[in-house]
Amino acid sequence: MNTIKTSIIALMSVALLGTITFGLIYFDRFDKGKSTMERTFAMIKPDAVAAHNSGKIIDIIEQHNFNIVGMEKTKLSKNQAQTFYAVHKDRPFYNELVDFVTSGPVIIMCLEKDNAVKAWRDLMGATNPANAEQGTMRKLFATDVCHNAVHGSDAQETAHQELTLFFPDLA
């Protein structure tokens, strides 16, 4: 039996100067049977934004058939970053991570695809770019473990939490 779901898709255009504009469009999607479609949270970190790699990263995301359901260019507050990285609060790198992610603009996204969490993690590559496979985001755009270009949820539950924090209507 088919069900109709109302979904939101963010239409965007990336100008040569890196400006991102948005419009929202609603559409009906017919789901047939059991679906593996899921959503995940993605972030282009300040190092990749500052290096003008955002457009390249977004192009690769689209080439791998992700639907960009929501996107925003923003600068995270210290409070947002602390909440986002709360799981690492007791780790020695926590303060450096918070300082880094608040050091400049980021691009946050809600991505949708079959098995989106795993697909995005595979496309990102290993946290340490030295260990990342050729063709992955981190092999292409990261410089070290901290400045590793992109973030992605590590599980469906984490994706839901991260999407709720930044895109509550899309979680």
Where are these regions (language model features)?
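Non-catalytic terminal and connector segments of soluble metabolic enzymes
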Residues: 2-171
